Design a protein with these regions (language model features):
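Catalytic beta-strand/loop cores that center a nucleophilic Ser/Cys/Thr
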Residues: 112-159
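Two-component/phosphorelay signaling modules centered on CheY-like receiver
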Residues: 16-25
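Extreme N-terminal starter segment of soluble prokaryotic enzymes
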Residues: 1-3
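Short amphipathic alpha-helix with an adjacent loop that forms part of the alpha/beta core around
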Residues: 35-43
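Acyltransferase
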Residues: 172-187
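Histidine-centered divalent metal-coordination motifs
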Residues: 78, 128, 168
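Cysteine-nucleophile active-site neighborhood
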Residues: 44-112, 116-117, 181-182
Length: 187
């Protein structure tokens, strides 16, 4: 079962539908609905931290849930990505440019399991005003995708199956998004 922690965002249900279409059952909980121990008791096979409004520290148990990536594969999308970076000590700040419903060209590190089988570059959908400051990326995390001007668009933990993407793989404006989510599910 894939557990989707919903940060009160309409994109959560796009993720729910796309991941569900890829096979595994998906359970959705709100970010203030359960404790970390209650989540552990569900024995999820993987966890997705959804997009959402605001800052990671204001998103219920989302930042605390990052620790579960030491036990099962974990993917953070947009706010979920920011929560991963912040949980390890990175700084979330205003993005260089507000990106709401815009596509950007991104360069992928194809050694990252999420980007297996993808071209070296691709278009992704962006809906965010906050981003991780590149000079504060914690040493535990490795940048695995960047915009052409160097803004971090994805990270991977160096030891655990923890991944974050600033962009929206569930959007039709991310043509390879379904492949990325399939790669995560197969992790």
């Amino acid at each position: 079962m894939t557990l989707l922690i919903d940060n009160y965002d309409s994109f959560s249900y796009n993720l729910y539908q796309l991941v569900g279409a890829l096979g595994p059952p998906v359970r959705v909980i709100r970010n203030d609905e359960m404790t970390i121990e209650e989540i552990r008791a569900l024995h999820p096979d993987r966890i997705i931290l959804s997009p959402g409004p605001g800052r990671p520290e204001d998103a219920g148990i989302t930042m605390a849930a990052v620790q579960l990536g030491q036990e099962v594969p974990l993917l953070g999308v947009c706010l979920g990505h920011q929560a991963i970076c912040a949980a390890f000590g990175g700084t979330v700040t205003y993005a260089r440019q507000l990106m709401h419903g815009k596509q950007s060209r991104v360069i992928f590190d194809r050694a990252c399991p999420l980007f297996r089988g993808l071209p070296e570059q691709g278009l992704v959908a962006r809906y965010h005003s906050l981003a991780v400051a590149a000079d504060t990326l914690p040493p535990e995390l490795k940048a695995t995708a960047r915009t052409e001007d160097g803004e971090i668009m994805a990270v991977q933990h160096r030891q655990y199956p923890i991944y974050g993407v600033q962009f929206h793989p569930e959007s039709i404006m991310t043509p390879e998004g379904k492949t990325m989510l399939k790669n995560f599910i197969e992790e």
